[in-house]
Curated annotation (Swiss-Prot):
Protein name per its UniProtKB record: Myb/SANT-like DNA-binding domain-containing protein 4
Originating organism: Rattus norvegicus (Rat)
Gene Ontology CC terms, in alphabetical order: nucleus
Coiled coil, from the record: 202-344
Residue span(s) of domain Myb-like: 4-77
Modified residues (Phosphothreonine): T188
Chain segments carrying region Disordered: 141-175
Gene, per the UniProt record: Msantd4
UniProt keyword annotation of Transmembrane helix present: no
Keyword Coiled coil among UniProt keywords: yes
Top-level taxon in the UniProt lineage: Eukaryota
Cross-link Glycyl lysine isopeptide (Lys-Gly) (interchain with G-Cter in SUMO2) per UniProt, renumbered positions: K9, K114, K142, K237, K254, K273
InterPro entries assigned: MSANTD4 (IPR026162), Myb_DNA-bind_5 (IPR028002)
Length: 345
């Protein structure tokens, strides 16, 4: 099986490590953010890439990547923890009154920084040369196919916050750090706000504002659409009311015609009664003549009612057609208005 070829890079110099620590403190709010989402992860990756660019600007010859500077920082943190544990063990061995609970905490790498750095002048945390004594595996960066994922659990937020606390030294040792002249930046992190180095938050805010504006416009259009729907329902209600009124009018007209018909029948009966009394001797022809007249009148009345019914049906059809045309024009007007608003900036 063919082995993977490994390419070793040179160790980080003192100047590169000091630049790395300074750039990390400038980006504290982003790198050690407790928020967990895609945007924050992207901002963290960009922050490490910017730190790598600052380290490369030192001009030591090696081109570092964001993953390499992040791994270097984790190795530096691990070395500081081991040195802190050794210092605590020395304090315990020399008779320093360290409580048992603090000793347990030191063994679990959670001891207080003030105890960890107390009375140990030889524990020079910024002495980057100590990395060479800690083993080459901490400083060698191997370019392989199986590279560690920067988003793996070893980069958890709690570990990164502890890492930051390891960077900040005791203020009483400020004058003992000649290799790190800008160490005062570590003291003022909590008292002075750091200068914003990213435009991403402003960009995100602008994107959110645009989203809110689009959502507001969409809600306005939805409200107008609901208003149009409400008006359409109101028009439909009015149309149904008119149809009911028309139905009632037709019913009244039918009753009126019924009354008219009854009246005509009574008139015929009253006019035919004397004729029947005076002409009892006439034949069958004279008796059937009034019945023929009545049948003819009923036929004419029926035809007139049918014509009236057809006329009303035609008017109803025309009314519905006009109503549909009105609604179509209203919908077309609304579509043109929405299209016009959609082209606005």
């Amino acid at each position: 099986m063919k082995q993977l070829k490994r390419k070793r890079k040179s160790n980080f110099s003192v100047q590169e490590t000091q630049t790395l620590l300074k750039e990390i403190t400038k980006r504290k709010e982003v790198i050690f953010s407790k928020q967990l989402n895609t945007t924050i992860n992207v901002m963290k990756r960009m922050a490490w890439e910017e730190i790598a660019q600052c380290v490369n600007a030192v001009g030591e010859g090696e081109q570092r990547t964001g993953t390499e500077v992040k791994r270097r920082y984790l190795d530096w943190r691990a070395l500081m923890k081991r040195k802190r544990m050794k210092a605590n063990m020395k304090l315990v061995g020399s008779g320093f009154p360290l409580p048992t609970s603090d000793l347990d905490d030191s063994l679990t790498e959670d001891i207080d920084e003030k105890i960890a750095f107390r009375n140990d002048a030889n524990f020079d945390w910024q002495n980057v040369a100590d990395f060479r004594d800690a083993g080459g595996s901490l400083t060698e960066v191997k370019v392989e196919e199986e590279e560690r994922d920067p988003q793996s659990p070893e980069f958890e937020i709690e570990e990164e916050e502890e890492m930051l606390s390891s960077v900040i030294p005791d203020s009483r040792r400020e004058n003992e750090l000649p290799d790190f002249p800008h160490i005062d930046e570590f003291f003022t992190l909590n008292s002075t706000p750091s200068r914003p180095t990213y435009d991403e938050p402003h960009l995100l805010m602008n994107i959110e504002k645009q989203k809110l504006e689009l959502e507001k416009r969409r809600l306005d259009i939805e409200a107008e659409r609901l208003q149009v729907e409400k008006e359409r329902l109101q028009i439909e209600k009015e149309r149904l009311r008119h149809l009911d009124l028309e139905h009632e009018r037709l019913q009244l007209e039918k009753e009126r015609l019924q009354i008219e018909r009854e009246k005509w029948r009574l008139q015929l009966v009253s006019t035919e009664k004397p004729a029947l009394e005076n002409e009892l001797g006439q034949g069958e022809k004279s008796m059937l003549q009034p019945q023929d007249i009545e049948a003819e009148k009923l036929k004419l009345e029926r035809e007139r009612l049918q014509l009236e019914k057809d006329r009303l049906q035609f008017l109803k059809f025309e009314s519905e057609k006009l109503q549909i045309e009105k609604e179509r024009l209203q919908v077309e007007k609304e579509r043109l208005r929405i299209q016009k608003e959609g082209h606005l900036p």
